[in-house]
């Protein structure tokens, strides 16, 4: 039986990744480097013989534009795509827009690490009258008050990502379609934790690099049997380490 594969791609570097700012649901675009990363991811997938039947992404343009660039390199720009807020980055609450290193200088490296990587720890909440509250954004007009976050932990992100996986994405994979997901560091960490049944301490140390294809292989029961990145292992490790260091004081 042929091995079933799934490809995950964290968006390429965004303008605020470059500025080391907490982004969350703020809709910043890719940097020039991020666009290059996305194109390189597409070329890697092409070189490895990947092609897809369906794509999923968030409603944030850094993920959408990453997917565009990947599919363009694969000559699959025509591919059907479903966009869902459930694949958005985790909401960073009142930290959105703040510089990570400056925040670490103010609150300490460990506090910022817990905000960034702690499983059930939420950053400080937004207020509903804050311009950053997603209820002011027309793309979220159909969401209920309960669905509109003021802040999120990874645990809360899992509560929206995993049902979307089980109810929407997995059935398509089970039907035989080849799927790619372009999303965000924490929405993908949420999915990886679920798929690999990771503990809270283990997920704390997982850093997903920007613009690198992450391939899952599944058995006939759609249980993961292998997870690996495409590309140069040393470069990928360096990029993951850079992600880990973003939240440290200078």
From Swiss-Prot:
Pathway: Carbohydrate degradation; glycolysis; pyruvate from D-glyceraldehyde 3-phosphate: step 3/5. Keywords: Gluconeogenesis, Glycolysis, Isomerase. Its EC number is 5.4.2.11. It comes from Pectobacterium carotovorum subsp. carotovorum (strain PC1). Gene3D superfamilies: Phosphoglycerate mutase-like. The lineage of its organism: Bacteria, Pseudomonadati, Pseudomonadota, Gammaproteobacteria, Enterobacterales. The record marks 184 as: Transition state stabilizer. GO terms for biological process: gluconeogenesis; glycolytic process. The active site is at 11 (tele-phosphohistidine intermediate), 89 (proton donor/acceptor). The gene is gpmA. This is 2,3-bisphosphoglycerate-dependent phosphoglycerate mutase. It is an enzyme of class 5 (isomerase). GO terms for molecular function: phosphoglycerate mutase activity. It catalyses: (2R)-2-phosphoglycerate = (2R)-3-phosphoglycerate. Catalyzes the interconversion of 2-phosphoglycerate and 3-phosphoglycerate.
